[in-house]
């Protein structure tokens, strides 16, 4: 999907800003937004902060600024080795941004529910060296890469929610001794009260394998990139917002 969680969240902030003078309307609007975005961590984060803030409008302005000024991609771009080959999966605007900033990094993009094709299209248009990898080629792609890049949709205390195939990608990298770097962008870190229900909704359905999401333990991650910097150890997941 090309419409990222970031774009949806920024649009929701604009909508919520129009009802900040009515706490009841703000609560109802936030609840309706979350019903339609059950795994959008930035949106859940923004809504939770807005409905509990003494000044919801100011809180929304702060959230919008932090999301727009997110420097995660810049930190990742600066850390990537020269002329490296990376393996990534699905769609991440921050990963794509980092690779476009570099230009010298080759990307092997494993598809996940068609999102890998969106990544390939954006990288190709920017002139990046990239190739789409079918799921059955995942292991060999990881072995051929210098770094495996994954992106957290939501970060919990012990694990992360990520696009389908991420657990397999990171597990292969871990087993073959390849570094796993993870992007945990602005507002993806959630408290247990928000993260656990999100994961339960994914795992509690009759066919969790068809949800499009994986739950990956922190232990598979060797380095983390957040808006505040990186590469940091996985311990950064415990404190990143």
Residue spans for each PLM region:
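Long amphipathic alpha-helical segments
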Residues: 1-61
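N-terminal targeting/anchoring "stem" of glycan-biosynthesis enzymes
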Residues: 4-27, 31, 81, 208-212, ...
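A short, well-structured juxtamembrane/interface segment
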Residues: 64-82, 91-95
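Nucleotide donor/acceptor-binding cores
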Residues: 83-84, 105
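Histidine-anchored nucleotide/phosphate-binding helix
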Residues: 92-103, 168-171
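Active-site core of metal-dependent hydrolases
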Residues: 103-111
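Conserved phosphate- and dinucleotide-binding cores of soluble alpha/beta proteins
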Residues: 110-241
């Amino acid at each position: 999907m090309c419409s990222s969680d970031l774009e949806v969240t920024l649009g929701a902030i604009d909508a919520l800003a129009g009802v900040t003078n009515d706490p009841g309307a703000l609560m109802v609007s936030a609840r309706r937004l979350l019903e339609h975005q059950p795994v959008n961590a930035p949106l859940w984060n923004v809504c939770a902060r807005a409905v509990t803030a003494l000044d919801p409008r100011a809180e929304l302005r702060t959230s919008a600024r932090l999301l727009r000024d997110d420097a995660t991609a810049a930190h990742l771009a600066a850390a990537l080795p020269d002329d490296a080959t990376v393996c990534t999966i699905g769609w991440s605007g921050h990963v794509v941004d980092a690779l476009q900033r570099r230009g010298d990094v080759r990307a092997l993009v494993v598809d996940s529910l068609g999102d890998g094709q969106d990544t390939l299209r954006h990288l190709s248009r920017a002139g990046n060296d990239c190739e789409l990898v079918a799921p059955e080629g995942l292991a060999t792609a990881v072995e051929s890469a210098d770094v495996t890049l994954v992106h957290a949709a939501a970060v919990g205390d012990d694990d992360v929610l990520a696009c389908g195939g991420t657990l397999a990608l990171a597990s292969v990298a871990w087993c073959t001794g390849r570094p796993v770097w993870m992007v945990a962008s602005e507002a993806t870190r959630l408290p247990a009260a928000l993260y656990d229900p999100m994961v339960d909704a994914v795992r509690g359905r009759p066919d969790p394998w068809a949800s499009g999401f994986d739950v990956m333990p922190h232990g598979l991650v060797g380095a983390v990139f957040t808006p505040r910097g990186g590469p940091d150890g996985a311990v950064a997941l415990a404190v990143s917002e």
